[in-house]
Amino acid sequence: MLHVTRQWLAAPKDVFRARKDFESSSRFARVAPYLLHLSERGTPDLHYLSVRRGNAGKVVLYFHGGAYVMGSARTHLAPLSRLARLTGLQIVVPDYRLAPEHPAPAAFQDAVAAHVALLAKGYQPQDIILGADSAGGGLALALMADLCARNLRPAGLFAFSPWTDFAMSGDSLRRNAAIDPALPVGRMRETVDLVLQGFPPQDPRISPLYAPFNAPPPVFVQVGAEEILLDDSFRMAQVLRDAGGQVTCDVWNGCPHVWHMLDGYIPEARAALVATAAFVATLQALVPIANR
């Protein structure tokens, strides 16, 4: 699955074809057993992933990655099914609108709508844990800033290799350009143009690095040491700490962008997901279902 995103970013390819290929690649996902996948039509559509055992009243609202131009609940079934099994929690994945058909801030608007939908189902703000990867990580952090400003603070947030700065100003873009195994800088900049289409790159709804945070909840970030987006994690962590937040930045050597997608193929993916489940347990006083 990771190779499809890499191919799209590395070489000229129609975004719609790349999106289709990414969806098709999900057939290779090693989905954790006993996964229940239900869908609900709406704006946006919501996908509910769970195992047969769970913790009532607790939920993860997860925003998939894919550079805002591809991805879905289906493409992320491997890591999300494993997280559902490790935590025992239901994971809700919105099908937020994608660029270039729906440029920024469409995804942010859908993220807010997904959160409203969970509140309408009876969840309290403190029962909602935000999770995400890559571009979805930026989206989740942008939503968290908005929720904190409106006193709807979530329990916490975890993010895998988050993309937090659409101004592309991090020094690791230059420093790690030759060693990042997944993301070429040039194609990332082209993707920025597809997503923004004139929208300000430093707007907090697309770049949470520039958002004000009012007493943010605990945050857990995992990122590869060789990623060009490494500084997106480091700088985001500092912004949150400056706002009084508690942040763990878990850096992994030798792991590509969102290596969690390779659960079932490489041991580092499972280990990272187990660590994430342990973080989730600290938020909700749960006992993680280790190594399932």
Regions found by a protein language model. Give the residues of each.
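Hydrolase active-site cap/lid region
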Residues: 145-199, 215
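Short beta-strand element of the alpha/beta-hydrolase
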Residues: 57-66
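A glycine/proline-hinged amphipathic helix-loop "lid/cap" segment
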Residues: 1-54, 285-292
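Short strand-loop-helix active-site module centered on a catalytic nucleophile
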Residues: 46-48, 61, 83, 104-166, ...
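Catalytic nucleophile-loop/oxyanion-hole region of alpha/beta-hydrolase
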Residues: 72-73, 79, 92-127, 263-269
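Catalytic active-site module of serine/aspartate enzymes centered on a nucleophile-bearing elbow/loop
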Residues: 265-292
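Serine-hydrolase catalytic core
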Residues: 200-255
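A fold-wide structural signal in alpha/beta-hydrolase
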Residues: 59, 88-92
